[in-house]
């Protein structure tokens, strides 16, 4: 079997799919994207195609190494996201050829189900509480919400009070009936993170995500030393070599590699194993589409340290398409009591509606994250 063609499709709301075709008619799907940089990743995918056309798709490890090492310059969000989507599609092909789901090819299940959590948007506490109530009605009891808006390097007590007030009202409304993580999106400086974490402790969030940027990862162990709240990060780390440094330094309780950013299934399975060796939990980052989610689930079901799975149903970014709009076998992604079950169809287990993909790719928007500025006009972290 040989790879004959690679096609990319930019899609709403902010996704990109790729299709790898073979001379025997077997097709694999992947999801390579950096949100707001889809065209750049798309160009990288087609550059990598030079290494792939005419090659045997079964040699996933060799093709991965060729893409990673053959160009001398390597790593980073663009190239690792391109590799990630290609890698997903290669595993999809392998599973279809062998008539087995990817988790079966990786040694089989370590669990029967994995808890899902849902994003909750809203700028005011009442909106967040209303969003949680609606999601509880369809079975969710675990959530993630933004921890704060933009925050200055040294900000005032009003900014701290606003962040804490939202969390306090949520805990008052629901008590211990729900769990929630707080995503700070790297918006907070190390000095302000210390203040916020101390103020949030009484409300027992499930985790705090990206309290500081990955570029300031040296602060993770320092922040962890002053709190009992688990600290999570990893969506902006792109290889096992980056994760190696933070695992060795300590501080993170939960790793969040993104299967569409960090080299795909092949790389993230290695990252999961590294995390287990350090007694660190795994919770793959996934505010993206169905192929990315499927890839995450296959890792979850073969990794003992996986604890819960992010998914994008109803997320505030989903304008123009929802999580399963491009999927024919929607029933396979249904949740029972807020848990996903293993995908059982061969390969990734996603039956893509190719006609719909082609149609909506003709008018896909170039999604950009907002540009935020502080009151003084300086650029803020989004």
UniProtKB/Swiss-Prot annotation:
Binds 1 Mg(2+) ion per subunit. Its EC number is 4.2.1.6. The record marks 258 as: Increases basicity of active site His. The active site is at residues 185, 285. Its cofactor is Mg(2+). The record marks 310 as: Transition state stabilizer. Signal peptide: none annotated. InterPro entries: DgoD-like, Enolase-like_C_sf, Enolase-like_N, Enolase_C-like, Galactonate_deHydtase, Mandel_Rmase/mucon_lact_enz_CS, Mandelate_racemase_C, Mandelate_racemase_N_dom. Mg(2+) binds at residues 183, 209, 235. It is an enzyme of class 4 (lyase). Pfam families: MR_MLE_C, MR_MLE_N. GO terms for molecular function: galactonate dehydratase activity; magnesium ion binding. It comes from the Bacteria. It catalyses: D-galactonate = 2-dehydro-3-deoxy-D-galactonate + H2O. Belongs to the mandelate racemase/muconate lactonizing enzyme family. GalD subfamily. Reaction proceeds via an anti dehydration. This is D-galactonate dehydratase. It comes from Salmonella choleraesuis (strain SC-B67).
